[in-house]
């Protein structure tokens, strides 16, 4: 994090690290720590002291909570990294290459433009769905196309409406347990249903 020099970094560990949901991290650069408070506070809120002590008191004990998801992170990093002969670098290369192949396979069918260059893809890719004049749903509702893909074909893939663009997007995620054949199946279904 020091090399990155970011003021703040946060991320979920459940997707790529295969840890339980709720296992996330928050990094706050030391010069920013006085600016950040937890949503719910505990006894640490009234304690005076240096910021390194205070931030731990405020964030670490915010009520009754099971710390198991966080405690899984180190072992998960080690275990998942061991699934490739090339460690995490090999896993990320695999995910990136599969995500690009998945996107390209789908774009061949949809004939919609690439949304970004390959260099911006790591493990996720998004494709623009054809402008099919389907009314956009609220962010709180499941998109009807998402529901159709899931119920009729057992495909779980997010479909998002973006009202600002008046368009919908389909997003894929690629990991070690995915195969190109799954994305080819998705492309066949898209060709049939769109």
PLM regions: where:
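Conserved PLP-binding catalytic core of the aspartate aminotransferase-like
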Residues: 92-100, 107-152
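PLP-dependent enzyme catalytic core of the Aspartate aminotransferase-like
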Residues: 138-140, 147, 151-152, 156-194
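Active-site PLP attachment segment
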Residues: 4-49
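Short Gly/Pro-enriched turn/cap motifs at secondary-structure boundaries
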Residues: 14-17, 62, 116-117
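Short acidic/glycine-enriched loop/turn segments that link adjacent beta-strands
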Residues: 20, 121, 165-168
